[in-house]
């Protein structure tokens, strides 16, 4: 589903940031949001995401298999979005203390809904947001 898109991260009752790309996919935006959050904060971090793509990679150790097998997936195909996965995996490994938890999207989770709203706004307006 290439097209314009937005990403966002939100700290409950705290800061937030959002951005956009003119041509992207939802998976790339989920990765970008996670990478930006991991790069922004020091210390222990809990990433709560509605992206099984991101959460399962770390929870189930996909990334370790990718590194061992030369960046091919279980289907023996090149891992998609490697240009974002590599810096994200490197950042998570370098800092440690990053945990991942999945939350169902559009299910009434206040902060997931807020991140989604900000991502849609950034993508629609083609602008960066922060606060």
Residue ranges of predicted features:
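RNase H catalytic domain
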Residues: 1-4, 16, 20, 34-114, ...
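Short beta-strand scaffold segments in enzyme catalytic cores
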Residues: 5-12
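A short, polar/acidic, helix/strand-boundary loop motif
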Residues: 13-30
